[in-house]
Each structure stands twice: as C-alpha cells, then as structure tokens.
Amino acid sequence: MNVKILTLVIVLVVSLLCSASAGPMASTEHSKEIEEVGSMRTPLRQNPARAGRSQRPAGWRRRRPRPRLSHKGPMPF
C-alpha cells in the first residue's frame, strides 16, 4: 500500500514540476518579442474557387431516393 502511495506522490510531483516549467505560461521579458516575431506570418491565400458561392444553398438537404418497386420485397410505403 505504501508503494502505491509513494509512486502516486512521485508521479504527481514530477508532473507538477514539468507543467510549471514548460510552455507559454512561463513569463519571460522577451516573450513579447517572440510574440511579435510569431505574428509576422504571411496570411494564406484562399483558393478563389472555394471562396465563392458554395455549391448548395444553405437549407439544402439530400433527399432519400425512393426504392425501386421492381424487386420483390415488403411494400416500401
């Protein structure tokens, strides 16, 4: 039982240390410079064929095709 608790505490401490030291949450003085450099990306050009009207109108739904009556089976309607 003590081994389980000990391993749980060790995993918890390690995960807290890793999460505290990692990533964008850490505040540094040059973080604004990094943000400015990161925001200098050129915007992607959209494909003009995609930017136009969509192929189907907004309220359009695909209708279920009526079953053929040529095959023998239960009456569809």
Swiss-Prot record:
Residues 1-22 form the signal peptide. It is found in: Secreted; Secreted, Extracellular space. Residues 21-77 are annotated as: Disordered. It holds the Pfam family Apelin. The keyword Cytoplasm does not apply. Disruption phenotype: Morpholino knockdown of the protein show impaired gastrulation and heart formation. Embryos display reduced migration of anterior lateral plate mesoderm (LPM) cells and cardiac progenitor cells (angioblasts) toward the midline during late gastrulation. Embryos show altered cardiac gene expression. Embryos with CRISPR-induced apelin and apela null mutations show a strong decrease in the angioblast migration to the embryonic midline during late gastrulation. The record marks 75, 77 as: Important for the balance between G(i) and beta-arrestin pathways induced by apelin-APLNR system. Its main location: secreted. Disulfide bonds: none annotated. It comes from the Eukaryota. Keywords: Angiogenesis, Developmental protein, Gastrulation, Hormone, Secreted, Signal. One of its GO terms (cellular component) is extracellular space. GO terms for biological process: angioblast cell migration from lateral mesoderm to midline; apelin receptor signaling pathway; cell migration involved in gastrulation; cell migration involved in mesendoderm migration; coronary vasculature development; determination of heart left/right asymmetry; determination of liver left/right asymmetry; drinking behavior. InterPro entries: Apelin. Coiled coil: none annotated. GO terms for molecular function: apelin receptor binding; hormone activity; receptor ligand activity. Residues 59-71 have a biased composition (Basic residues). Peptide hormone that functions as endogenous ligand for the G-protein-coupled apelin receptor (aplnra and/or aplnrb), that plays a role in cadiovascular homeostasis. Functions as a balanced agonist activating both G(i) protein pathway and beta-arrestin pathway of APLNR. Downstream G proteins activation, apelin can inhibit cAMP production and activate key intracellular effectors such as ERKs. On the other hand, APLNR activation induces beta-arrestin recruitment to the membrane leading to desensitization and internalization of the receptor. Belongs to the apelin family. This is Apelin. It comes from Danio rerio (Zebrafish). The lineage of its organism: Eukaryota, Metazoa, Chordata, Craniata, Vertebrata. The gene is apln.
